[in-house]
Each structure stands twice: as C-alpha cells, then as structure tokens.
C-alpha cells in the first residue's frame, strides 16, 4: 500500500518538475550538471531549491502528500541503524487522509512487530524497487492484488465475517442489469451510486468504469468522471482502508466512503459506528452484503431503527 501511494506521488513529482523547468530552465538536469563543474555549492543549493518547490507543488495541488522528503529507497540508503526511525518519520508525515488509512491497517503496530523480528529493512527492500505506478498497474489491477492478499490471510475468518469478494465478471453483469440512465455525452446532472457493504470498492469502481466505457469522446469521459458520484460504507477496517486509498489515488474527490456498520443507527448510545449515510437518498444501489452472518450482537441496535428501515420485517439473527 505504501509503495503504491509513493509510486503515484513520484509520477506527480515528475510532472511538477517538468512544470518548474519550463518556467525556469536553470533547474534542468543539464544546467545543474554544468553548475556542478564551476560551483558545487551553488549546484547543491539549486537541487535543494528544486526539491522545496516540488514539495510546495505537492502539498498545494494534490489531495494527498508526504512532507518528510523520504522515500523507501532513500530510507534504505541511509544508515541501517536509522531505518526504523526514518521509516516511522516517513509514515507519520503523510496527509491526514492517508494517515487515516494507515491507522485502519493498524500499520504502526505491524511495524513494531516487524522490527522485533528484525525484518523491517528486508521488507522495505523487497518493495522499494517495485513499479506499482498506475502506468504499470491500473487501479482495478491493484485492487486484485489487495483482494488476493486479504483473501490469502483471512480465508479462515471469511465465513464468519461474510467477507467474500465478488468476481469482476459478476459485477459487470450486475451493472448491466441496473440499466443506469446516464448518457455520458449529454448528461448535465450528477447521479449517485451507493454500496452499503462496499468492501474494497470493486462494485462502485466497476460501475463507474462501465459508464465511462460508454463515452464516445474525451469530453464524455470527463463528463462521466465528474458527474458519477460514488458512495459507500464498509465495516471491516482493512477493506475500508483499501477502498478509501483507491478513491484517493484515483482522484475521486467527490466520493463519500465511510467506515462503520450500515445496518445499525449511528447514535451516541451505541459504541460502534453506525450508518453514516442516514437520511441521504441515492439514484442507484448495488451490493453483495454479508449474507448468512450472525447479527445477534447487533439485534438490540437494529430494533432501534424500527419500521423506518425494516418495515417489511427482519430475518433471524443467525442469518
């Protein structure tokens, strides 16, 4: 996850660097190399000034950033005795939206465990050179990676949690059956899609992809990207973190992905986070909810919703 975020930031930094050089050619690699030959100190100052400008671009223009100046590669290049300290500084320097994702993954606790096993450097080394940029792996392909890893390490628990991943092919059929009324070329009004048990966000992402694929022009694609608003809620922290990260990295600034149990009310008397979309209305909804999961521990909370949501009755608490 961290390497994916870093890879996306690296692409943006390259773009920012090009913009800066177009405005001031003295920052080009060629001119800095020439400056090195005559005045090494000024050349180093120029490099630091360029880094500072790129960092300003990053924090001002992107919905997420890292203000530490570290990368996984540069952490490894420093003293081996400082790897943990520098890595923690790196992790703690992300913007608040990425920091929330790190928390949901319980990443800092994992770092402590890995350090105790003396494996932090080897794990960083394993991923630092990998190209996880969108140029090599699309967001959907990266979703496959996340889902396969989560499945691999949670298969024993999946039956109890209702955590099952819907194949992409099935999602596409579901989206086709919805017959969403939206013309990418002529639409003027936004439409909203909602998944109350969104997992890693596959259904929402593919639903939007499906509509983008209908566009015949670049304007139609842009129109769809702007007007199709994704909304979702997920109970399991890691799945929520993956979904949230995916939306941020894709630039889905209008999306509304929340964490909690969408089946219970969100009120102070209940410790768990409940429905974060109460009172909202959506144009279309699709989902693969956790069928067959025992919800007896939430029964009392569900009853508080009364007929407002479950007017037609409720299934047994063991299903």
Role assignments for model-derived ranges:
Residues 288:
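Conserved active-site aspartate in kinases
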Residues 122, 160-163, 186-189, 232, ...:
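Alpha-helix N-cap/helix-initiation motif
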Residues 117, 279, 318-319:
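Short, solvent-exposed loop/helix junctions and linker helices
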Residues 164-284, 292-294:
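Conserved S-adenosyl-L-methionine
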Residues 1-182, 256, 262:
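Non-catalytic, mostly N-terminal accessory regions of nucleic-acid modification and defense proteins
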Residues 155-160, 191-193, 225-230, 309-315:
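Glycine- and acidic
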Residues 291-319:
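Mobile active-site "lid"/loop adjacent to the S-adenosyl-L-methionine
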């Amino acid at each position: 996850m961290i390497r994916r975020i870093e890879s996306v930031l690296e692409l943006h930094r390259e773009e920012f660097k090009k913009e800066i050089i177009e405005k001031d050619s003295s920052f080009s690699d060629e001119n800095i190399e020439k400056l090195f030959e005559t005045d090494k100190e000024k050349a180093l100052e120029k490099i630091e000034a360029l880094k500072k400008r790129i960092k300003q671009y990053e924090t001002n223009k992107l919905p997420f950033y890292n203000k530490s100046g570290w990368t996984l590669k540069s952490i490894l290049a420093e003293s081996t005795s400082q790897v943990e300290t520098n890595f923690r500084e790196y992790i703690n320097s992300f913007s608040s939206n990425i920091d929330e994702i790190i928390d949901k993954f319980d990443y800092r606790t994992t770092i402590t465990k890995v350090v105790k096993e003396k494996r932090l450097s080897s794990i960083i080394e394993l991923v630092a050179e990998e190209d996880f940029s969108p140029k090599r792996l699309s967001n959907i392909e990266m979703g496959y990676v996340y889902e396969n890893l989560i499945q691999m390490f949670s298969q024993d628990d999946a039956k109890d949690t209702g955590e099952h991943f819907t194949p992409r092919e099935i999602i596409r059929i579901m989206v086709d059956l919805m017959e969403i009324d939206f013309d990418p070329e002529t639409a003027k009004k936004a439409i909203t899609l909602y998944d109350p048990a969104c997992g890693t966000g596959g259904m929402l992402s593919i639903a939007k992809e499906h509509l983008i694929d209908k566009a015949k022009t670049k304007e139609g694609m842009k129109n769809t990207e702007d007007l199709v608003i994704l909304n979702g809620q997920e109970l399991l922290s890691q799945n929520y973190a993956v979904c949230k990260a995916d939306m941020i990295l894709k630039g889905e600034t209008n999306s509304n992905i929340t964490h909690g149990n969408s089946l219970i009310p969100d009120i102070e008397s209940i410790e768990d986070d409940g429905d974060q979309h109460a009172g909202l209305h959506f144009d279309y909804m699709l989902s693969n909810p956790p069928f067959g999961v025992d919800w007896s521990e939430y029964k009392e909370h569900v009853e508080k919703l009364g007929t407002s949501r479950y007017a037609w009755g409720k299934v047994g608490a063991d299903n």
